C-alpha cells in the first residue's frame, strides 16, 4: 500500500500534513495533522504553500503543479500506462522526478529540485513541514 510505503520513508523529524484522498479510514497510526478528504480551499492553500509535492502522476495533478511551479516527485500507479508515460516524459524536466512505487525510499527525499519558477532550489528539507495526499491521489507537499 502506497500510504504505508510513504509513511515509512518520510524522515522521522518531518512535520507533515496528510491528505489521503479517500473517505475510507486509515488502518495505519497517523500521528500528525491529516485529512481523509480535504475541502478544495484547504487543498488550494496547502498546494500554494508547498515546496514539494509527492503525488501520483495524473494529468490534472501535474497541471496544477506545473501552473504553480511546485517541484513534484511523481509516483505512477503501477499498470496505469498514461501515468507511467507522463512521469517518464516529465522526468527530464528539473521540476519533476519520477519514482516507481517499488523504489520509494527515504533517499528520494534527497532529490535536488530547481523549479522553473525558482520556488525551490537545493535539497528539499522535510523538517520544514509537509503534506501527504495518499492512496488514489498520493501527494506530499512541504508548506512554507
Give each language-model segment a name.
Residues 41-42, 61, 107-108, 130:
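Short acidic active-site motifs
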Residues 109-144:
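C-terminal amphipathic helix plus adjacent low-complexity
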Residues 1-52:
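Donor-nucleotide binding loops and adjacent catalytic segments primarily
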Residues 42-85:
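A donor-sugar binding/catalytic signature common to diverse glycosyltransferases
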Residues 16, 72, 97-98:
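Hydrophobic beta-strand scaffold residues
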Residues 21, 37-41, 77-82, 103:
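Short, acidic/turn-prone active-site loops that include or flank metal/cofactor-
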Residues 27-29, 44-48, 83-88, 107-109:
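Short, charged, surface-exposed secondary-structure boundary motifs
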